[in-house]
């Protein structure tokens, strides 16, 4: 039985410019069946999280221009689960906006935030890590990211350097490094202290909102006044009018 306090936010608003010409602005990569499975990357991501998150607790944040594509590919998702961005503002506003919305639904919510375009081969191990991470953030006011043990020096990924342990298989983060040069990537891998940054995050909703208020006060000041709109049928109309 899935935990009703657990939520998922799938970020699906990118235009996938690095995969041009396969991925285009009108049909970006998350809506494509890249691997011939019969399911797009977005659909595979939804299917994956549906195994550990209640269906009604999975939200898709996407650009308003992709609303019809999301509805077509995920007919089991209600309109209230599709949060439409009026403009692309990158990750922080996307996460903060979804968090305010989810807190209005459930002030005890634990959230996993995931890109819509990941390929996951060891799905059982992945989902076990997600469940363990959500349990951790439900008991700890920490921001959690999922690291992947590197098997080669890769310059296309970000790296996380771990610090002291914070529990079994949990570590404090010492540094983040975005896409290092090859020689530095080799040093990272050989040290055993670095993990690839997966781009997946987990936290309790109150923890992330407090972090937004403390670290991004200008952003939080724009989102906090919407408390009467979040978790209502006004959210779609408001999101298409207001630019953050």
Regions found by a protein language model. Name each.
Residues 122-154:
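Conserved donor-nucleotide/metal-binding helix-loop-beta segment in metal-dependent transferases, i.e.
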């Amino acid at each position: 039985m899935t935990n009703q306090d657990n939520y998922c936010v799938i970020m699906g608003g990118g235009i996938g410019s690095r995969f041009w010409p396969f991925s285009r602005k009108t049909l970006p990569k998350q809506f494509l069946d890249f691997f011939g499975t019969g399911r797009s990357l977005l659909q595979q991501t939804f299917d994956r999280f549906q195994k550990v998150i209640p269906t009604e607790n999975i939200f898709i944040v996407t650009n308003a221009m992709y609303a019809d594509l999301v509805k077509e590919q995920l007919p089991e998702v209600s309109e209230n689960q599709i949060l439409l961005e009026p403009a692309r503002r990158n990750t922080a506003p996307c996460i903060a906006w979804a968090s305010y919305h989810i807190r209005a639904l459930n002030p005890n919510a634990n959230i996993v935030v995931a890109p819509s375009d990941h390929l996951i081969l060891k799905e059982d191990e992945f989902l076990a890590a997600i469940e363990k991470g959500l349990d951790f953030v439900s008991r700890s006011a920490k921001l959690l990211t999922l690291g992947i043990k590197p098997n080669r020096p890769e310059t296309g990924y970000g790296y996380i350097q771990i610090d002291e342990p914070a529990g079994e298989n949990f570590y404090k983060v010492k540094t983040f490094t975005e896409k290092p040069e090859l020689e530095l990537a080799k040093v990272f891998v050989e040290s055993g202290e670095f993990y690839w940054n997966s781009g997946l995050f987990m936290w309790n909703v109150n923890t992330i909102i407090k972090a937004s208020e403390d670290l991004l006060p200008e952003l939080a000041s724009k989102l906090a006044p919407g408390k009467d709109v979040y978790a209502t049928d006004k959210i779609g109309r408001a999101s298409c009018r207001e630019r953050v």
